[in-house]
Amino acid sequence: MNAVDPNRAGRVVFGWNSVRIVVPTMLLASLLAAAAWTIHWPVVGDAPLLHYVVFLIDHGRVPYKDIVEIDMPGTYALQWAAIHWLGPGGGGWRVFDFGLMAAAMAAMIAMTWPEDWLGGFFGGALFALIHFRDGPTHTGQRDLMMAVMTLIACAWLMYAVRQKRVWAAGVFGLFAGVAATVKPSGVLFGAVLAALLWLRLRELKLAKAPYMIASTVGFAIPVIACGLYLVHQGALGAFVAVMRGIAAYHASLGRPSLPVLIVGSFPTVLLTVAIPALALLVLEKTWKRWEVQVMLACIVMGATSYIIQGKGFPYHRYPEEAFLALLCGALLVGGMRATGYRRVIAVAGLLAGALYLAPSSAAIARGYDWHDQEFQQMLTADLTQLGGARLDGKVQCFEMAAECQNTLYNMKLVEATGYMYDCYLFQPQQTPVSLKYREDFWEALHANPPQVLVVTDQECFKQARNFGLAGRWPQFQHYLESEYTLAAQRTPPHTLGWWRHPAVPFSYQLYVRRQP
């Protein structure tokens, strides 16, 4: 990508060699430190739920049909690959997370290579460090997978145009298709990038049909593969029903206001490098160049994806953060070959990223208390005492992500039903979709009554802890009180350090089915 005038590319700039030594050295040191400080992070947050879905699939359950869960088939496929190729525990998951970061950096370097690899390295390093500073609950997130797949797609897109390779357009489409099978908003990226490809081909007076056909075929491959898998499993109808029903209902819950989402969509963590980079974008008029337009379009699509998802979670910004970090790297490194105050702006931005943002992010990543596994340890001890392996198929969790299913995963216990979340069962305002979910769960519960129920105090999308959720469904409350006995209630003694600010630990109640 030519982020600056090619006529200035060979100009000798005072201090450039020093910056080329200091910036990558500090970035690399911060990356290595962060990797060393986070390599022992366990599988926590959303990842255990998806690990458990893969575990259930391996034990004969079919997604959407037997496992009522709202994630996309591509997510399960990548999660399955990580578990089976790298290992089922925390070590394998860290390797997968590091691998995603390495792939993101490689794609960024490929995109900036024609001018200077350092721009891609700068962007990739900052993106990785921002990801690490978000903490252990953000490892391997679906938006991270989508962001990395889109970065790789863009790298092949630029290669296809630069080298005039039709087959590379097919590879672009392939990775864009994978992104779309991970998160529905991946379709936005694919569509916008295809439009930019068409416009660039028209500008270069190249035949558009071969490139567009190749990219469309590439995009279709992972989409069709997922469809064929669902058809083979007899789950295509169930998938459509879940997406139209409970997934859409999930999207309506816990939504901040639109102004809050719009403000929150900008990754303020990157301000120290974004301000000088965006100044250069205007001063150097690099926004006119096609490669920069690709990055800007992906930034806009990333913000759009964040707003559409409507939860305000930090990891929903990953696609936007990835491309913004890349753009900053390309513009700041390119700006080093400018003159006067523009070069000063570029140097300031590069040093701010390398000397402040990178090491501070690594230090924040170090500060998480990842050792806390008290919930799992306590629940494992209780379930072992109640039968251990004999509880296979006879235990049911009521949670959203409070570590109950993570415990079952580590104990290799299959749940009694395929219903993963209690979030939709106990909403204060029920809808036809959630009432249908209740009805189906009720039927599954009575088809295979669990011997043990684990009820957590987690209330989805809220920080408060609440054991009174069952009271919102009187029929279930009566069933719980008449058919089960409260055997134990446990609260871990220490706060959870998985987030920037320690949180109240999750508690659980253990109910045992009464003997007839």
Task: Give names to the regions the model predicted.
Residues 2-7, 11, 189-220, 281-286, ...:
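Perimembrane helix-loop-helix junctions
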Residues 95-118, 152:
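Transmembrane-helix motifs of polytopic, lipid-linked glycan transferases
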Residues 73, 77, 86-103:
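Loop-to-helix entry region of an early transmembrane alpha helix in multi-pass inner-membrane enzymes
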Residues 108-130, 147-148, 161-167, 293:
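Transmembrane-helix signature of polytopic, membrane-embedded enzymes
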Residues 188, 309-343:
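Hydrophobic/aromatic-rich transmembrane helices and adjacent perimembrane loops
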Residues 167-184, 189-196, 221, 299-308:
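Membrane-interface alpha helices of multi-pass inner-membrane proteins
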Residues 113-114, 118, 153-171, 203, ...:
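Membrane-interface transmembrane helices that cradle and orient dolichyl/undecaprenyl
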Residues 187, 373-431, 435-465, 491-495, ...:
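Short periplasmic/luminal acceptor-recognition loop of GT-C membrane glycosyltransferases, typified by
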